[in-house]
Amino acid sequence: MNNIKLPVLYCPFPSAINQHCEAAYQHTLEWVRSFNLLEELACQKLFAANFHGLMARVYPNASLKALEILTDFMYLGTIVDDAYEKAGTSKQPDLLEPEQARLLNILKGAELTDVDTPVALAWGDFVQRLHQFPYVTSEWMLYFVKHMEDYFQAARWEALNYSQGIMPDLVTYIKMRPLVFGIYPFFDMILIADGIALPPEVIECPAVKQMGLAANNAMAWANDIFSFKRDIKEGMVHNLLLVLEHEYQISLEEALKRAVELYEAEVQNFIELSLQLPSFEAGIDTNLERYVLALRFWMSGYLDWIMKSRRYGKFSEYQLL
């Protein structure tokens, strides 16, 4: 495994970094500490993963106010996601549902209480601030809530698999991975970060949804390609390479080759779909073009970040060509 060489993944999209990256980082670091979400050593380890750098790359045009809440959301989501993985590997997946239900109720308007956890209190602060953005309409909230519900349900599925030692088959994994990955709520945030107004007929357009799925899949496969070493070390079975290896009884090297092919196919699919989108009307088409550009920044920014993040090991450890 140590000698496996990963190729440089294909991504023909522009890259940029938000000028407010450092300020957003300082804000979120204090925000996480203010809610006592982590012990100090765990906090330092988490921020070493540079998720603030990820947010600055995938939302390069966001204002400072927007980037702050996006970075808060990213770090809080990571804390929650790591807790869900731990619940699964410690064979306690039933712990997830009550907390998830509480977070969803807060998102839908429930008041905070004295018995809420630090995560719930931080989430409540996030939700309150979220409503201050003009593009957070009732329609937008419906999509955001639905995508959070989908993520929570998928996280329970993943945790149950971990607790029971279940390796999903390839078809099931490909179906569930976009939901477990948790990117759709961040795609919703593009409208906040870039000030884009898209009516429901555009958001629900099959071609637009397929384009979003292609972007989601490409990043999920990139994640699995770069994280397989950590996943093997930690006993995680939810990884495309490991699923391919198990499904087809092939070597890890061959699984890597097939995973890269799946990644490249999704990038090409995204390109083709983005060039074949239907026309709506002038103003809407302009905003849709901006949305496509934002997805391109997501794909390139995510790849830039994951190649450098300490969360998955140093770039040099993988001996990239």
Language-model features: where?
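Alpha-helical, largely C-terminal catalytic domains
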Residues: 1-321
